[in-house]
UniProtKB/Swiss-Prot annotation:
This is IAA-amino acid hydrolase ILR1-like 1. It is an enzyme of class 3 (hydrolase). A motif (Prevents secretion from ER) lies at residues 439-442. GO terms for molecular function: IAA-Ala conjugate hydrolase activity.
Length: 442
C-alpha cells in the first residue's frame, strides 16, 4: 500500500514537472509566433545568441574569408543535431531542418564584415585591425542560429523542410550569386531575408511589397592627359580639369535625364590624381556608384555614364577608359518583394509583435545581394528588424566605425524567421497525389 502511494506521488511529481516544462517557452506551439518569441527571450536562449554574436564580432572576416565564422556555424549546427552541406561559395553553409521533403522554404543570413577600423571601446571590440562587423551581419548569423534551434526543437511538427542559408560576401562580393551558381538553393519555393535597422524601434518590423532596395553598380575611369609644370599649363593636357568637368556632367544624368518619379543616383566617391602642388599629373582616376529601381533605368545610366566620361574627356583633349568592375563586383539587381509574401509577412509578424508594430518601409537606394535569389527562387521577401532604443542614446548608422548592435533585438529576429518558415510550410502543402512528384528533395 505504501509502495503504491509512493508511486502515485512520484507520478504526480513527474506530471507537475512535465506541465511546468510545457508551460515554458520551449513548449510553445510552432504555429504560435508570440510563444516562439517568449522562447527566444528566455535568459538562457537569449544569452546563448548574445554569446554567439559577440564571438563573431570579435573575429570579423571579409567576403569569402569567413572561415572561422563558417566553422562556428557548423559547430553550433553539430551541437543542435542539424545536418548541413559545406562549402558553397568558399565558406557558405546550407543546413536543413524538417522532413527532408517538399515544400522547401529558406532563411538566409550573411556572414561577412567590413574593411574598417572599429572605434567603439567595449569588451568585445574587434580583435582584427582594419576589420569590423559594422553592418550587423554578426547579429544576422546569431539570429539564424537561433531560428535553427527553435525549428529543431519543433522538427517533428514541421510540414516540410526549412533550408538555412549562411552566405558569404554580401558586401559587394555577390556571395548570393555564387551560392546560386553552386546549387545551394535548388528546388526552394520561397526565401526570407532580414536586416537589423538602426532607425526602426526595437520590437518593430518594417517592409513593403515590390521594390524595397535599389539595383547598384560601380564604375571606375582613368582619364589620361599630358603632365607637366603647373606654371606652364599650356604645355600640358590637364586631366584634373577634364575629370572635374566629367563629374559635373555626371550629376546632370539624374537631374536632367531621369524621370523625377523614377529614383536614381549617380555618385562619384573616388578622385585620385597628382601628388604635388606644382605638377599637373599625367592621369586621374575617378570612381563611383550608380543606383536605380528599374532595370531599364539602370541600363540607361550605365550607358550614359560611359558616354559622358569618354565624351567630356575628349572635349578637354584627354582620353578615358571606363571599367564597370562587374567581374569582381557583379551588378546587384533591385530587391523586389513578392506581393503575396508581403501579405503573409504582415499576418505572421502581427501575431508576434502586434499590428501596430508592423510598419511600411520606404524604398531605399541602398543595395542588397539578396536580390540575386529572385533569379533562382519563385518568391523572395526582405524585411527590416528594429533595434533602436532611445534610452540607449544616439544610434550610429550602418557602416559607421561607431555602429553597435542592440542585442535585445536578437530574440525578435530568431523567432520571426522561424515563424515565417514554419507557417509558410503549413500553408503551402503540396497537393496529395498517388504518384511521387519530381524534385521532391534538395
Amino acid at each position: 500500500m505504501a509502495a503504491a502511494s509512493s508511486s502515485r506521488v512520484l507520478l504526480a511529481a513527474v506530471a507537475v514537472l512535465a506541465a511546468a516544462l510545457a508551460g515554458c517557452g520551449a513548449g510553445a506551439a510552432l504555429d504560435d509566433p508570440a510563444g516562439l518569441l517568449r522562447r527566444a527571450k528566455e535568459a538562457e536562449f537569449a544569452g546563448w545568441m548574445v554569446g554567439l554574436r559577440r564571438r563573431i564580432h570579435e573575429n570579423p572576416e571579409l567576403g569569402y574569408e569567413e572561415f572561422a565564422t563558417s566553422e562556428l556555424v557548423r559547430r553550433e549546427l553539430d551541437a543542435l543535431g542539424i545536418p548541413y552541406r559545406h562549402p558553397f561559395a568558399v565558406t557558405g553553409v546550407v543546413a536543413t531542418v524538417g522532413t527532408g521533403g517538399p515544400p522547401f522554404v529558406a532563411l538566409r543570413a550573411d556572414m561577412d564584415a567590413l574593411p574598417m577600423q572599429e572605434s567603439v571601446e567595449w569588451e568585445h571590440k574587434s580583435k582584427v585591425p582594419g576589420k569590423m562587423h559594422g553592418c550587423g551581419h554578426d547579429a544576422h548569423v546569431a539570429m539564424l542560429l537561433g531560428s535553427a534551434r527553435i525549428l529543431q526543437e519543433h522538427r517533428d511538427e514541421l510540414k516540410g523542410t526549412v533550408v538555412l542559408v549562411f552566405q558569404p560576401a554580401e558586401e559587394g562580393g555577390g556571395g548570393a550569386k555564387k551560392m546560386i551558381d553552386d546549387g545551394a538553393v535548388e528546388n526552394i519555393e520561397a526565401i526570407f531575408g532580414v536586416h537589423v535597422a538602426d532607425v526602426v524601434p526595437i520590437g518593430v518590423v518594417a517592409s513593403r511589397p515590390g521594390p524595397v532596395m535599389a539595383g547598384s553598380g560601380f564604375f571606375e575611369a582613368v582619364i589620361s592627359g599630358k603632365g607637366g609644370h603647373a606654371a606652364l599649363p599650356h604645355h600640358t593636357i590637364d586631366p584634373i580639369l577634364a575629370a572635374s568637368n566629367v563629374i559635373v556632367s555626371l550629376q546632370q544624368l539624374v537631374s536632367r535625364e531621369a524621370d523625377p518619379l523614377d529614383s536614381q543616383v549617380v555618385t562619384v566617391g573616388k578622385f585620385q590624381g597628382g601628388g604635388a602642388f606644382n605638377v599637373i599629373p599625367d592621369s586621374v582616376t575617378i570612381g563611383g556608384t550608380f543606383r536605380a529601381f528599374l532595370k531599364e533605368s539602370f541600363n540607361q545610366l550605365k550607358q550614359r555614364i560611359e558616354e559622358v566620361i569618354v565624351s567630356q574627356a575628349s572635349v578637354q583633349r584627354c582620353n578615358a577608359v571606363v571599367d564597370f568592375l562587374d567581374k569582381d563586383r557583379p551588378f546587384f539587381p533591385p530587391t523586389i518583394n513578392s506581393a503575396g509574401l508581403h501579405d503573409f509577412f504582415v499576418k505572421v509578424a502581427s501575431e508576434m509583435v502586434g499590428p501596430k508594430n508592423v510598419r511600411d518601409k520606404q524604398p531605399l537606394m541602398g543595395a542588397e545581394d539578396f536580390a540575386f535569389y529572385a533569379d533562382a527562387i519563385p518568391a523572395t521577401y526582405y524585411y527590416f528588424l528594429g533595434m533602436y532604443n532611445e534610452t540607449r542614446g544616439p544610434q550610429a548608422p550602418h557602416h559607421s566605425p561607431y555602429f553597435t548592435i542592440n542585442e535585445d533585438a536578437l530574440p525578435y529576429g530568431a523567432a520571426l524567421q522561424a515563424s515565417l518558415a514554419a507557417r509558410y510550410l503549413l500553408e503551402h502543402q503540396p497537393p496529395t497525389t498517388g504518384k511521387a512528384k519530381a524534385h521532391d528533395e534538395l
